[in-house]
Design a protein with these regions (language model features):
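Alpha-helical scaffolding within the catalytic cores
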Residues: 1-6, 54-61, 89-92, 143-147, ...
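Beta/alpha (TIM)-barrel catalytic core signal, keyed to glycine-rich beta->alpha loops juxtaposed to Asp/Glu
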Residues: 110-168
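Glycine/small-residue-rich loop that forms an oxyanion/phosphate-binding "nest" at active or ligand-binding sites
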Residues: 77-126
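Active-site beta-loop-alpha junctions enriched in small/polar residues
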Residues: 22-24, 47-49, 75-79, 107-110, ...
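Short, acidic/polar
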Residues: 24-37, 82-97, 119, 144-148
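Conserved hydrophobic residues forming the short capping helix/wall of the S-adenosyl-L-methionine
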Residues: 60, 64, 94, 128, ...
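Conserved, mostly hydrophobic/aromatic
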Residues: 19, 36, 44, 56, ...
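N-terminal binding-site loop/beta-alpha segment at the start of enzyme catalytic domains
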Residues: 1-70, 100
Length: 168
């Protein structure tokens, strides 16, 4: 099962279905992710806050699937909002994942009360320009927040990942 892909406005594409890795840790997590890749998942969704980027990276290495055939998404945690903090956080994520690039880097939550998401967005634009991330996006942003990013930077997120499930 290889999922169909959707084209993004930045020219990249994402599989329609991905494997969420929240809660997948240690050896059991590695095995679950390797199994998911073997079954055809090509989009792996992790986050700094999940504490399992190293597990995802190890599963990718063990999977036998070429890195360029996988889409790895990770997310900037709220405590790392700000320009310099965003740059440093991605470097930490890349080190834990043991990858040269991240395919999709998202701001995990906007945290409007600290109002640093635009600074983080500017850093993410720079990271994309440097080739360290392929696509940049956000998670759980409102339309007004998306408009603000566009107004202040001229760059619209390629993705706005929305959390939605029966327990949310």
């Amino acid at each position: 099962m290889i999922a169909p892909e959707y084209s993004l406005r930045d020219g990249t594409s994402l599989p329609a279905i991905g494997l969420g890795t929240y809660g997948l840790n240690e050896q059991a997590g590695i095995e679950a992710i390797v199994s998911g890749i073997a079954e055809g998942y090509r989009l792996l969704d992790t986050a700094y806050n999940y504490g399992n980027e190293d597990v995802v990276g190890e599963a990718v290495r063990r999977s036998g699937v070429d890195r360029s055939d996988l889409v790895i998404t990770t997310k900037l945690p709220g405590r790392h909002h700000g320009y310099d903090e965003t740059i440093a956080s991605l470097e930490e994520s890349r080190r834990r994942l043991d990858v040269e690039w991240v395919d999709l880097y998202l701001i995990h939550w906007p945290l409007p009360r600290i109002d640093k998401f635009v600074d983080s967005w500017k850093a993410m634009i720079r990271l994309r320009e440097r080739g360290l991330v392929r696509s940049i996006g956000v998670s759980n942003f409102t339309a007004d927040m998306l408009d603000r990013l566009d107004r202040e930077t001229g760059v619209v997120p390629s993705v706005n990942q929305i959390e939605l499930h029966p327990y949310f």
